[in-house]
Amino acid sequence: MQGTDEAPEFKCKCCGLCCRRDPYYAISLLDIQNISMGLGLRPEIFFSKYCEIVTTPGGFRYSAILAPDGCPFVKEGLCGIHFVKPIGCWVFPESSLLPVTDLKKHVNAIPTCGILGMADNDQALKADYELLAARDVQFEHTKKYYEQHDGFEEKTWREATDRLIEKLGDAEEISRRAEAIRAKASALIDRSKNRSVKW
């Protein structure tokens, strides 16, 4: 992972609680391709068996893996689709960009998470900013797809996914976005430091 040298690195304890706490897990158009290929299923079959289109509290429509009893791909506490897991899972918990001390307050609902055992720190976790940029591109395209389509349909999904893959191949765009995320992370850290100085 790329990040600042002094940034603490998260070490997952593989407790699996983060995979069992939400009723659904958002997935991108590319996630649908990767997971369905990993499972040996046609995308439409994967989608109809495991997914639904959900509307977020902000009013955005996304595809999501339904998880009323936890992610259906967790096996014995571990991810059964690790090598093709959703982009949102790849970037958790680094995607928060919060300083470790603040992040610990947000994950206290996951009492076995490795973050809670980390020393307080005013730095964000070491993060791969290019991967975070790719995540943003994937979900922007996914959001746009569901603004234009009422449901999942393999032909239009394939066309949209091909455009998404082309966009992800734009190294200059990913680099620009990664720098913007890095700047946002620095601003969050500075804001946190200023708050702690006032106390």
Which residues are covered by each model-predicted region?
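Short loop/turn segments that flank or connect secondary-structure elements
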Residues: 1-199
